[in-house]
Amino acid sequence: MADKKGSNSEKLLYCSFCGKSQHEVKKLIAGPSVFICDECIDLCNEIIRDEAAAAGVEASLSRSDLPSPQEIRDILDQYVIGQERAKKILAVAVYNHYKRLKHLDKKDDVELSKSNILLIGPTGSGKTLLAQTLARLLNVPFVIADATTLTEAGYVGEDVENIIQKLLQNCNYEVDKAQRGIVYIDEIDKISRKSDNPSITRDVSGEGVQQALLKLVEGTMASVPPQGGRKHPNQDFIQVDTTNILFICGGAFDGLEKVITDRTEKTGIGFGASVKSKQERDAGEVLRETEPEDLIKFGLIPELIGRLPVVATLGKLDEAALMKILVEPKNALVKQYHKLFAMERVELEIRPAALQAVARKAIRRKTGARGLRSIIEQALLDVMYELPTMKGVSKVIIDENVIDGDGKPLLIYEDTPKVAGSN
């Protein structure tokens, strides 16, 4: 009933859906013999939005909308500088994976297996950014997990199922969406076993975690606790099938190039033997020759390597690549700082020599692209601290001396240039 008589004989109106009176809600909208309140309208809009978003994910993965490998590569180029071979390998692997999902419902004699991906490359070479960009491009749930925090079930640390729990959180616990997501497991090299022989002692954060990851990566029905954390006997679990989740594992694998070099450059003895320094070859070039036996010798178990059939290697970024990373991508660091200063109505100019100094410093620190922001932050700290309270500044100029710590930013006022911090 949409209306009732009040004690003062005036007609009191009620929402036909939730039963709240007109005094309990902000607005009551009338229809033919029915009323609906603003709260119910908001709830309906939310339901429609969620269903539209779910339909959007399905539509985005349909064959007609699934970008081709070349289109995936072109989009990766907008965000990631260099690493051309790795981008091509990833584009093909991701395209084939979601093309396979599109045809799951079709009955066929040939069953297509999942091809998970292993990314090998130094810190700051773009492994995580590549995975993040792929997930954003495909509009699928995405989560980053740190392998170093994982332990075997029953020990202090995170169970491997917690990775899937985080994936569920990222898509509001919609199981169907989570089952088509992407999981990036970082620092996979840090859980290598201590020797290439099977362990006879318990290694709960190394080989034990690799064993725990096996079924998850290959495809299993994972029992996920809804609120995360450890499992409890009286707890209800969410069942998630990981068969169609794409797993991308990444790691720096420091020392792997030595393992590969020892295998490929077995020199002879005598006057005819070729004497060649192992340092002559670029590390990225060496890593491209990675074979499963090298990864086993490094400390990954053969079973896990077999479940990561697509291997993409990334090389170290040189000075020219780091300078491009600073200015060329859509969300390049220099563009971000230009925007920050523009909010203060100040123009920021970072001169080419300063960009070169930033790149050189990142190479010295061996942090790759990941260390670029901290270098610029350090150089701009004083001027960003003082700028909001300064009057009349129209432009800030950064040269190489500022980056090297030998000078201060040049501030351009209406007519007279001044140095930051000078009176």
UniProtKB/Swiss-Prot annotation:
PANTHER family assigned: ATP-DEPENDENT CLP PROTEASE ATP-BINDING SUBUNIT CLPX-LIKE, MITOCHONDRIAL, ATP-DEPENDENT CLP PROTEASE ATP-BINDING SUBUNIT CLPX-LIKE, MITOCHONDRIAL-RELATED
Task: Please give the start and end residues of each transmembrane region.
Answer: none
Does the record carry Metal-binding as a key word?
yes
Task: Give the record's subunit note.
Answer: Component of the ClpX-ClpP complex. Forms a hexameric ring that, in the presence of ATP, binds to fourteen ClpP subunits assembled into a disk-like structure with a central cavity, resembling the structure of eukaryotic proteasomes.
Q: Which Pfam families match?
A: AAA_2, ClpB_D2-small, zf-C4_ClpX
Q: Which GO terms describe its cellular component?
A: HslUV protease complex
Domain of life, per lineage:
Bacteria
| GO molecular function annotations of the record | ATP binding; ATP hydrolysis activity; ATP-dependent protein folding chaperone; protein dimerization activity; unfolded protein binding; zinc ion binding
Q: What is this protein called?
A: ATP-dependent Clp protease ATP-binding subunit ClpX
- Per the record's keyword annotation, is Oxidoreductase included, yes or no? no
Q: Which amino acid positions bind Zn(2+), per UniProt? A: C15, C18, C37, C40
Any idea where the ClpX-type ZB domain is?
3-56
The free-text function statement in the UniProt record for this protein reads: ATP-dependent specificity component of the Clp protease. It directs the protease to specific substrates. Can perform chaperone functions in the absence of ClpP.
Q: Which GO terms describe its biological process?
A: cell division; proteolysis involved in protein catabolic process
Q: Which family does it belong to?
A: Belongs to the ClpX chaperone family.
Q: Which InterPro entries match?
A: AAA+_ATPase, ATP-dep_Clp_protease_ClpX, ATPase_AAA_core, Clp_ATPase_C, Clp_protease_ATP-bd_su_ClpX, ClpX_bact, P-loop_NTPase, Znf_CppX_C4
Binding sites annotated in the UniProt record for ATP: P122, T123, G124, S125, G126, K127, T128, L129
Annotated keywords: ATP-binding, Chaperone, Metal-binding, Nucleotide-binding, Zinc
What is the gene called? clpX
| Organism from which the protein derives | Burkholderia vietnamiensis (strain G4 / LMG 22486) (Burkholderia cepacia (strain R1808))
